Amino acid sequence: MSGFYDVIKPKTARPPVWFLRQVGRYMPQYKELKGSQTLKAFFHNTEAITEATLLGPSLLKVDAAILFADILSLLDGFNISYDFSPGPQISFSPYEELIFTKDPQETFSYLLQAIKNLVKALDVPLIAFAASPFTMASYLLDGGASKDFPKTMAFLYQYPDKFDALLKKLTEGTVIYLKEQIHAGAAAIQLFESSSLRLPSELFSRYVTAPNTQLISQLKQCIASPISLFCRCFDENFLDLYSIGADTLHPDYHVNLNKIYKTVPQPGSLQGNIDPTLFLLPQDQLLAHLEKYLTTLKDQPNYIFNSGHGILPETPLENVQAAVLCLTSISTS
């Protein structure tokens, strides 16, 4: 379970470094690039996707680029209406039949051409991504992001068979969506199970472990590229993810990575999972936290340094740059 690490590892003996949401509103250069475009228009603009993605490696000097897109881009394949005002707003009925596009290359041409452009322009690997099934379903049923996803949970409890059918349809579409991105040139896949923290522990296996196992299994039947799963959960549920077949596991900041390394006999490749609020601290305090964090992690095999959630909009760019400089200056013993 180290293929994802192998794709992005640097030539020097240190952990690779990249971040969730490493390009975004905290960057003045991104704000200038976006200008007055709506977010949806920006996400459908091949040149904008290309230029925004390049900001990560160029400004931060990280070891990988992640495609600048949104998890809702998948919905183009289902012809589901959505917008950002400013957050995600989705028009969806759980009783409508989901049919995925028969021509994904045309439907996602704006994204696939950006990937082809980026592969030529980048000197680091490009990561494609998508939401995992439960997370995508939660956005659909609640009409966007939500703290507690009440409509999702009510539908799940009241109509478990229909919810399972929705997860199956989303899985099928996601496989096609990601397969096309890999064929366009992306080197690896990051899956995001961002809504999973809402689930009671006893439902985690059914709605997170099982659907992600199916998704990863189907992906590996048609592509050879490595897959990482980011999942919001606690230590107990995180251990359940070792059965899903991912090449790398990426917990959010709720999981104690040191504990995982001490208690799991073969922890495999892990990435994460520093709390992104630490990037808001004065630089000396931030760097002190990073050095403490890496004391035990930097020598772990196949470890990738990353954040435990996306970089916050109010983060000073210079703090992230200082963090990368600190992290890329270390060496393993």
From Swiss-Prot:
InterPro entries: UROD/MetE-like_sf, Uroporphyrinogen_deCO2ase_HemE, Uroporphyrinogen_deCOase. One of its GO terms (biological process) is protoporphyrinogen IX biosynthetic process. Gene3D superfamilies: 3.20.20.210. Its EC number is 4.1.1.37. It is an enzyme of class 4 (lyase). GO terms for molecular function: uroporphyrinogen decarboxylase activity. GO terms for cellular component: cytosol. The record marks 70 as: Transition state stabilizer. PROSITE patterns: UROD_1 (PS00906), UROD_2 (PS00907). Its main location: cytoplasm. It is found in: Cytoplasm. The keyword Lyase applies. It comes from the Bacteria. Keywords: Cytoplasm, Decarboxylase, Lyase, Porphyrin biosynthesis. Pathway: Porphyrin-containing compound metabolism; protoporphyrin-IX biosynthesis; coproporphyrinogen-III from 5-aminolevulinate: step 4/4. It catalyses: uroporphyrinogen III + 4 H(+) = coproporphyrinogen III + 4 CO2. Substrate binds at residues 21-25, 70, 139, 194, 309. NCBIfam families: hemE (TIGR01464). Catalyzes the decarboxylation of four acetate groups of uroporphyrinogen-III to yield coproporphyrinogen-III. PANTHER family: METHYLTETRAHYDROFOLATE:HOMOCYSTEINE METHYLTRANSFERASE RELATED, UROPORPHYRINOGEN DECARBOXYLASE. HAMAP family: URO_D (MF_00218). Belongs to the uroporphyrinogen decarboxylase family. Homodimer. This is Uroporphyrinogen decarboxylase. It comes from Chlamydia caviae (strain ATCC VR-813 / DSM 19441 / 03DC25 / GPIC) (Chlamydophila caviae).
